[in-house]
Amino acid sequence: MLPERLSNGICSLNPQVDRLTQSAIMEIDKHGRVVNYTITQTVINTSFRMTYSDVNDILAGDKEKRQEYQKIVPSIELMAKLHETLENMRMKRGALNFDTNEAKILVDKQGKPVDIVLRQRGIAERMIESFMLMANETVAEHFSKLDLPFIYRIHEEPKAEKVQKFIDYASSFGLRIYGTASEISQEVLQDIMRAVEGEPYADVLSMMLLRSMQQARYSEHNHGHYGLAADYYTHFTSPIRRYPDLLVHRMIRDYGRSKEIAEHFEQVIPEIATQSSNRERRAIEAEREVEAMKKAEYMEEYVGDEYDAVVSSIVKFGLFVELPNTVEGLIHITNLPEFYHFNERDLTLRGEKSGTTFRVGQQIRIRVERADKMTGEIDFSYIPSEFDVIEKGLKQSSRSDRGRGSNRRSDKKEDKRKSGRSNDKRKHSQKDKKKKGKKPFYKEVAKKGAKHGKGRGKGRRTK
């Protein structure tokens, strides 16, 4: 956000030079509770400029790295222990751990994507996150108790109807959930995600839980943070790249000089909070669209190739499928070899004649048919394989659940009539992808011509 002369200059913690900073200095007990703190202006002079990889290597026992940074190895190990304490504290109080991963799309000098890799989240990354979370909470609680105008980062409780949809969806996987949608606790949601850890559908279930939550936003009123199970929260730790953080730094400085400035902040914070929330949503949407376009551009070179993939979502007009490199595409229902019944209750597609059934988390063999970098759309086709699940002899659903007709031709017509536009399948698929948010990303791309039976990576973590 700030110009590079500032972000990489006087605002950057370069080694062996003094830097003027705003610091939250906290004393934390063995249970992860802040027992004493000071928020003040300080001067920092760092010894080394390190990378996350350096710290992860040190904690993993790399002899060369430990020798290179031997002066601070004890401090790094102590920081890792503190992180573990803070993480355990958050889990015990009910913080939700959305296990999602992010992609890093590598491009050449011309901006053409050449690879898609997984953003690493080792102990070092999580350690810094723990410290930032605690600093944000401490600063927010400080100003709340002073009863001064302030900007908070809030995450309100999810709406009951959205939680009920998640409960219904989770039940389709055989999960027993205790409690009603309006009273379900964060601990129960934690238990659900722990119970499915390692399952093929864990990634999708985690995403469905995330989508059942309300969107975090900025506000002049403190409503706590549901996802973190925190009573107070703000954004304080990233003033270089986020305006609300910069505003918090200004308030710390200005309130330290005079309380009379409170009237000014009381007037401007509501508009700033609304504007910052709106801009954040626009930035996220732009990021998703660009990511989809770059993934489609990357896959243009692989049209016609076959891969093992995993069903990531099932809708009435087809199924979305994800490759091990996190690229997602659509197999439209009209491109399947027979008529398929859509079961909205358990989100399955079942072939009327063969009994071939598709479920979320199931492996599937596909061919890349089309990739459009301008729209970010990717089309796959289904290839029969040893992954196919046959469920014959099952009673078919009622007429209302039989889809959009008894053959593919009438299915197309009914689909157009219900949608009110001829290109319903592409617009629905594009809209559905936009709502999904980020998908899990894996380091290795599926290899061309991979043999049947190749497994899928796992893991998804986010807040």
State each model region's role:
Residues 323-326, 384:
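Short acidic, flexible loop segments centered on an aromatic residue
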Residues 315-317, 327, 364, 374:
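A generic "binding-loop/recognition-motif" signal
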Residues 1-323, 330-337, 409-413, 418-440, ...:
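Electropositive polyanion-binding surfaces
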